[in-house]
């Protein structure tokens, strides 16, 4: 296939994909949100009414004066967000006609104070603003200079494709930018507003029609079918890059696992480990069984598990009977002898005395009682009255003889006890007999059988031959069997926060935060009624610790370092106050040489004559001066003193209003153009209130601060969340603060500050540029793209990142504590 044919097929494929999704704005409802239809606006909706639109195909609505509340219901908003949530390719489409000088919100998606997506048009500053939150949850604002509030119909399209942003106005591509990728991970409770930010702010005034959100690539085609399409989109490309990064991560993890597996295999080749059990010096292998007294035991996973032996009744032949055998738990058949009307077991002896008193000893052998030869008896060292005759021996013993010292059958947990003429077995305390001769005994579980003396507030724990009474949590011991409540508060053995009160309870305690603090008792944080603004921290009840550059009970007041003399800028620079900071900005006629010295020392003169940045006409000669220039008339020549401004000749003494700013006037003074804001004379009844809002005395022109408490007069200005705000005839208009140019490779936005600063260490930079050509080589020699992160091989708490082609690793202290 030729290259030309390939390109044609690819383009055709992209066009088919695009048209199949958007044709007629109704083919695939799952990809679009028809906002006006879903909100069910009508004549009964306060603040809006239906009016003729740009066309008659759909309804158009006039958004009138406040108050109004055009907000999607919870169910409707959630339907919107289900389509939008976690999508990186979507387009906002709207047809509108906004009245002159209105500053209003077209649509807003926000949760609490976090604006996830808000589109705003300012007629005061002639710009379109996009407010959004990135994937790092940081707020961003993109400003597009454009006059949208001109009382004319416009078609607006704002298309997102991952980090690619395109703004079309009336089917013309106005702006195309690479931005931080917006976050569409919308939490529950997020709200959707149309034509306003909330009930009190951002009222759009004008007409809206065809308000749609399309969750698809190149949604602007629905509004302008003839526009060019790009295939693949930025989001497609970003997805491919993301997949490559994921595959790299999988490869790295797989390599690490393989390396660890090889190490383990090498160790396993050197040794063989098997779990065994050792009993009384004998070692048993896994699953091996044995008999231990009256129990059958098995070695399972290195643990001994035993069950009581069940003894079957033996079926003995004639001249035999069941009897215990040494070393065996169960009875076995044993031969018997009949003698003098009684049965004797094999080996059992009995004495018989003759009429003369002579002792004869018999023993059962081969089922017959046979005479045992008398070998004589040892002498006794006790009187005859203390001598005892035995039934199994002709030799007497002294009273107190230790029969247990001879051979006996008492096994583990059984003890031998001496009687007057023999030895018997007896179970130890806490054990019970497993057979009638007490030779074998087992532990009694006093806890399970209720044979313990543990009282309330204790737990019974069985031990070999006994039990223990353990105190329950929150109790302390009185004696071996009882416990009483423990006052953790009194003994300071509680987990309450230092700013909490401890209350003792039965079996425990409760923690309650002190007045002025909030939390669950174990953790209490200071509570400041009015909050701490501008990054301040509440450190005690209604006490804010303000960051550098702010002061006031709530850190609401910016310290003007310039006017209060805290800083001294170079003579070639002016001190510009910023919220929490300041900036030495080069004065007119100077520019920075690229060193960006904080005090303005790097400001140097601009050669207006050499660069053409002057207003001298052709009949004069431009002479450069330090911080300016001079238009000089050649000797002997009569010069007009005219000026050149924006390509047009202005005569000396001429005054004119700027075309793009009706509130500024300029004049030509002997070759120099001087421009300034219009002087506001509030005594003049014809004063332009749009240029001089401070001259508007009407209460209806006052504005309410975003906190809902402070009231401003028309013309007042203030700073709110790194934005400059102004009250203009009842409308609040806010725009991002103008930050000094940061012309360095790496920058960082310090916490609680509004403007970025330069840093030399790329690992300190918090901005990761969208440049996949910059890569890093990790410790496993795997190539990583800029923006990727991973846990360093061989560690658990070392996080590495590839930032702008630089490898940056750091140890997480919290992770180390959790190990």
Swiss-Prot record:
Q: Quick one: effect of changing residue 501 to A?
A: Abolishes binding to ROBO3. Abolishes axon repulsive activity
**UniProt GO cellular component terms:** extracellular region
* Domain VWFC: residue ranges: 275-334, 701-759
| One MF annotation (Gene Ontology) recorded for this entry | calcium ion binding
All copies of the EGF-like domain together span: 400-442, 443-484, 485-525, 526-556, 558-604, 605-640
Pfam families (UniProt xref) = EGF_3, EGF_CA, Laminin_G_2, VWC
The residues that the database entry marks as glycosylated are 56, 228, 296, 301, 520, 551, 618, 638
Keywords on record: Calcium, Disulfide bond, EGF-like domain, Glycoprotein, Metal-binding, Repeat, Secreted, Signal
* List of residues binding Ca(2+): 443-444, 446, 462-463, 466, 558-559, 561, 577-578, 581, 605-606, 608, 624-625, 628
Q: Which GO terms describe its biological process?
A: commissural neuron axon guidance; fertilization; neuron cellular homeostasis
Keyword Disulfide bond in annotation: yes
State which tissues express it: Expressed in brain and testis but not in epididymis. Expressed in regions flanking the commissural axon trajectory, including the ventral horn.
> Phenotype upon knockout?
Deficient male mice exhibit infertility, impaired binding of sperm to zona pellucida, and impaired sperm migration in female genital tract. Postnatal differentiation of the initial segment (IS) of the caput epididymis is completely abolished in Nell2 deficient males and continued throughout life. Ovch2 is not secreted and Adam3 is not processed into its mature form in cauda epididymal spermatozoa, leading to inability of spermatozoa to pass through the uterotubal junction and to bind to the zona pellucida.
Q: Where in the cell is it found?
A: Secreted
The residues covered by the Laminin G-like domain are 67-231
**Signal peptide (UniProt feature, chain positions):** 1-24
This chain's function reads:
Plays multiple roles in neural tissues, regulates neuronal proliferation, survival, differentiation, polarization, as well as axon guidance and synaptic functions. Plays an important role in axon development during neuronal differentiation through the MAPK intracellular signaling pathway. Via binding to its receptor ROBO3, plays a role in axon guidance, functioning as a repulsive axon guidance cue that contributes to commissural axon guidance to the midline. Required for neuron survival through the modulation of MAPK signaling pathways too.
Q: Which protein, by its recorded name, is this?
A: Protein kinase C-binding protein NELL2
User: Whose protein is this, by species?
Assistant: Mus musculus
- Print the organism lineage: Eukaryota, Metazoa, Chordata, Craniata, Vertebrata
């Amino acid at each position: 296939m030729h290259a030309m044919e390939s390109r044609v097929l690819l383009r055709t494929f992209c066009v088919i994909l695009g048209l199949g999704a958007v044709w007629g704005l109704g083919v695939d409802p799952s990809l679009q949100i028809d906002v006006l239809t879903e909100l069910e606006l009508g004549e009964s909706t306060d603040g809006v009414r239906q009016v003729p639109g740009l066309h008659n195909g759909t309804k158009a609505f006039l958004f009138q004066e406040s108050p109004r509340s055009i907000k999607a219901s919870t169910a409707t908003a959630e339907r919107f967000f289900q389509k939008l949530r976690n999508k990186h390719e979507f387009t906002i489409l709207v047809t509108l006609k906004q009245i002159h000088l209105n500053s209003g919100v077209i649509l807003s998606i926000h949760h609490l104070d976090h604006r996830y997506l808000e589109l705003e048009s300012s007629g005061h500053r002639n710009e379109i603003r996009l407010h959004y939150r990135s994937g790092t949850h940081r707020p961003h604002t993109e400003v597009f200079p454009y006059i949208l509030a001109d009382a004319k119909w416009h078609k607006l399209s704002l298309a997102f494709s991952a980090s690619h942003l395109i703004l079309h106005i009336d089917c013309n591509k106005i702006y195309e930018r690479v931005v931080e990728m917006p976050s569409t991970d919308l939490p529950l409770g997020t709200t959707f507003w149309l034509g306003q930010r909330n009930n009190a702010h951002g009222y759009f005034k004008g007409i809206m029609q065809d308000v749609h959100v399309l969750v698809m690539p190149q949604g602007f085609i629905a509004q302008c079918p003839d526009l060019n399409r790009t295939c693949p989109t930025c989001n497609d490309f970003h997805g491919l890059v993301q997949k490559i990064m994921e595959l790299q991560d999988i490869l790295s993890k797989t390599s690490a696992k393989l390396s660890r597996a090889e190490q383990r295999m090498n160790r396993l080749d050197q040794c063989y480990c098997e779990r065994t059990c050792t009993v009384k010096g004998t070692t048993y292998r896994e699953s091996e069984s044995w008999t231990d007294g009256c129990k059958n035991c098995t070695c399972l996973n290195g643990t001994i598990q035993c069950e009581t032996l069940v003894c079957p009744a033996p079926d003995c032949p004639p001249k035999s009977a069941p009897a215990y055998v040494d070393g065996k738990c169960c009875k076995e058949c044993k031969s018997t002898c009949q003698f003098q009307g009684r049965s004797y077991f094999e080996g059992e002896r009995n004495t018989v005395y003759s009429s003369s008193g002579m002792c004869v000893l018999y023993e059962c052998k081969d089922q017959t009682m046979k005479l045992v030869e008398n070998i004589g008896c040892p002498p006794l060292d006790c009187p005859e009255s203390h001598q005892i005759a035995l039934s199994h021996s002709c030799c007497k013993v002294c009273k107190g003889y230790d029969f247990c010292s001879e051979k006996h059958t008492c096994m583990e947990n059984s003890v031998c006890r001496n009687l007057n003429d023999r030895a018997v077995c007896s179970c130890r305390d806490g054990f019970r007999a497993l057979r009638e001769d007490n030779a074998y005994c087992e532990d009694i579980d006093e806890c399970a059988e209720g044979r313990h003396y543990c009282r309330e507030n204790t737990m019974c724990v069985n031990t070999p031959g006994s039990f223990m009474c353990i105190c329950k949590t929150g109790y302390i011991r009185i004696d071996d069997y009882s416990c009483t409540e423990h006052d953790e508060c009194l003994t300071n053995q509680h987990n309450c926060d230092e700013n909490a009160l401890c209350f003792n309870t039965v079996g425990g305690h409760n923690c309650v935060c002190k007045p002025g603090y909030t939390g669950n008792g174990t953790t209490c944080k200071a509570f400041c009624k009015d909050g701490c603004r501008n990054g301040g921290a509440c450190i005690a009840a209604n006490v804010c610790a303000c960051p550098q550059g702010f002061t006031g009970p709530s850190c609401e007041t910016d310290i003007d370092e310039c006017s209060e003399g805290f800083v001294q800028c170079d003579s070639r620079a002016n001190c510009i106050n910023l919220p929490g900071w300041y900036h030495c900005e080069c004065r007119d006629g100077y520019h920075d040489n690229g060193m960006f010295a904080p005090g303005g020392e790097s400001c140097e003169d601009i050669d207006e004559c050499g660069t053409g940045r002057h207003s001298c006409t052709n009949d004069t000669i431009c002479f450069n001066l330090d911080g300016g220039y001079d238009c000089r008339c050649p000797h002997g020549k009569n010069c007009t003193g005219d000026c050149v401004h924006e390509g047009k000749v202005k005569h000396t003494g001429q005054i004119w209003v700027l075309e793009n700013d009706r509130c500024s006037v300029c004049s030509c003074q002997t070759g120099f153009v001087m421009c300034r804001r219009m002087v506001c004379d509030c005594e003049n009844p014809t004063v332009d209130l749009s240029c001089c809002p401070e001259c508007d005395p009407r209460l209806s022109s006052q504005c309410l601060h975003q906190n809902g408490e402070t009231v401003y007069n028309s013309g007042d200005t203030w700073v709110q969340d790194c934005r400059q705000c102004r009250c203009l005839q009842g409308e609040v208009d806010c725009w991002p603060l103008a930050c000094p140019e940061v012309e360095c490779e790496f920058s960082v936005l310090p916490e609680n500050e509004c403007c970025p600063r330069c840093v030399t260490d790329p690992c300190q930079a918090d901005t990761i540029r969208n440049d996949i050509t910059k890569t890093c080589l990790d410790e496993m020699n795997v190539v990583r793209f800029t923006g990727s992160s991973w846990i360093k091989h061989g560690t658990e708490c070392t996080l590495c990142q590839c930032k702008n082609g630089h490898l940056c690793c750091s140890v997480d202290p919290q992770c180390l504590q959790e190990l």
